[in-house]
Structures are given as structure tokens and as C-alpha cells.
């Protein structure tokens, strides 16, 4: 049985850890509130951009454009959004599993790692990291998203990669986040988004022609999807960390309660033993 000193030392250590996890939970809660407000504010624009492109492709017939068909290269670019820090439950590992447990061939992937944890995990598994941008997850901005998208799109138009994918975490609510993998290029028509009968009477004209219109709008469309995913991932990270720290704080509280009970029992046993020895000594003197 552990001594009173050991129990007290362990209780003190767990209490210190509990204070840290509680503080981290509060920090994540504040960050989550800001990120959630940002995500909700920008979501309508990105959804509208997505529906616009889907509708445009559905009503334009069979357009011929490089953005609409896979390139000749067998290589695939995957932009992977993870966090720079751990202590977020399965947030990072769930994203990495989309890559490692999917249908991709490791030797055909070019990884653009946004977030240090994703880079670490994928590097350890032997994946080729083309670019690393951990700073982007600290304070996501549209300008940074546009700059990275420009480089990834150049790899596509130059024929270095034939397809572009995005792995991110979709923010459903505070307690639910979903790891998702979507294809950015070539653009694929979403039948559910394109089959909107209420928009069928809208007449679309492209100036000077549909191909040149796509040349301008597709990069903005891809950047919009990427930035939207970046904002959602940032919110999801803080939601996942808040849950993890809440669980850790609760577990620490249970352990402290259990150790307090053990300490009191040990103390009671020690007092009882001392009284017994005193009584026995008194009886011996008599």
C-alpha cells in the first residue's frame, strides 16, 4: 500500500496537471468561439461560389478546359490541413488516415502540409512533402490561402500533377467534427447542387466565352473552397482540443477525489495504530 507521503505527492502532481488542462480548455473555448463566428460569417459566400460554379458547368454543355479533366501525370497533389500542436484527441490522426488508408499510392503523392503535425506524421511514414506551411494554421487568412492555391494550381497547369485533393476537418458543431477528403481539380459537377430547377430560367452569358470565364473563376473557386476548409479546420481543431482537455480535467478530478479518499483512509489507519500503541504502552506500565 502506498504511503501517505506518496499519495500526497501524487495528488499534488495530478492537481497541477488538472490546472493546466483546465487553462488549455478555457483558451480553446475562446479560440473556438472566434473561429466559429468566422466560419459562420464566411460560409454563405463559399457555398454560393460552389453552387455558382456547379450551376455554370451544368448549363454550359460540354466545355473543353484543362481544369475540367485530369492531367496526364499520374501524380496527385494533396493539401493536408492539420494542427501545429497535439492534445486534440484524434483530430490529426483522423486526417492522416484519409491519406494512409485511402486508395492513394504513396509514391504518386505530393503533399502540401498545412500544419506541423500532419507533416510530422506523413514524413515518418515516408510521404513526399512538397511544401510545409505551419504558420497558416495559427492565423488563417484569405491571402495566404490564395498564395498556396496559386502554387498548387501551377503544378496542375504545368502538368506536374494530374489531380488535386484537399484533406480537412469539417466543422459540424462544437462536439462533432468530420475528417473529409475532396477533389479540387479537375472540377467535378455535383449533381445535387447542379439540379436546381428553380434556377433553370436564369440565362447565363459568358464574355468573351465560357472557356475564358472558367480560366478566371475556377482559381477563385478553388481558393474559396480551400479557405473555407482552412477556417473550418481551425474551428474543428479548437473544438477537438476543448473536448480533450475537458475530458482530461474531468478524469483528473476523479483521480484527485480517489486519492483524497485513499489519503484519508491511510491517515485514519495511522492514527488508529498510534492510539493502539499508546494504549498498549500504558497497559504495560501498569
What is each of the regions a protein language model found here?
Residues 1-286:
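C-terminal beta-strand-loop-alpha-helix "lid" module of Rossmann-like NAD(P)-dependent dehydrogenases
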Amino acid at each position: 500500500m502506498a504511503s501517505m507521503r506518496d499519495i500526497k505527492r501524487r495528488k499534488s502532481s495530478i492537481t497541477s496537471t488538472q490546472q493546466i488542462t483546465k487553462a488549455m480548455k478555457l483558451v480553446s473555448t475562446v479560440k473556438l468561439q472566434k473561429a466559429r463566428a468566422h466560419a459562420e460569417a464566411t460560409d454563405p459566400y463559399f457555398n454560393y461560389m460552389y453552387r455558382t460554379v456547379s450551376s455554370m458547368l451544368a448549363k454550359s454543355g460540354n466545355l473543353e478546359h484543362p481544369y475540367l479533366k485530369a492531367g496526364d501525370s499520374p501524380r496527385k497533389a494533396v493539401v493536408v490541413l492539420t494542427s501545429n500542436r497535439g492534445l486534440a484527441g484524434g483530430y490529426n490522426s483522423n486526417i492522416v488516415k484519409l491519406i494512409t488508408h485511402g486508395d492513394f499510392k504513396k509514391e504518386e503523392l505530393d503533399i502540401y502540409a498545412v500544419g506541423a503535425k500532419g507533416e510530422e506524421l506523413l514524413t515518418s511514414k515516408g510521404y513526399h512533402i512538397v511544401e510545409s506551411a505551419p504558420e497558416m494554421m495559427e492565423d488563417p487568412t484569405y491571402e495566404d490561402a490564395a498564395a498556396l492555391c496559386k502554387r498548387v494550381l501551377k503544378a496542375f497547369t504545368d502538368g506536374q500533377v494530374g489531380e488535386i485533393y484537399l484533406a480537412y476537418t469539417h466543422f459540424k458543431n462544437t462536439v462533432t467534427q468530420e475528417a473529409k477528403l475532396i477533389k479540387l481539380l479537375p472540377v467535378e459537377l455535383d449533381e445535387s447542387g447542379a439540379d436546381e430547377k428553380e434556377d433553370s430560367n436564369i440565362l447565363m452569358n459568358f464574355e468573351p466565352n465560357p472557356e475564358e470565364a472558367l480560366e478566371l473563376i475556377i482559381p477563385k473557386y478553388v481558393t474559396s473552397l480551400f479557405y473555407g476548409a482552412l477556417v473550418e479546420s481551425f474551428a474543428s481543431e479548437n473544438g477537438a482540443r476543448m473536448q480533450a482537455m475537458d475530458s482530461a480535467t474531468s478524469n483528473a478530478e476523479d483521480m484527485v477525489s480517489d486519492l483524497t479518499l485513499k489519503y484519508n483512509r491511510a491517515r485514519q489507519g495511522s492514527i488508529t495504530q498510534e492510539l493502539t500503541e499508546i494504549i498498549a504502552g500504558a497497559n504495560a506500565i501498569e
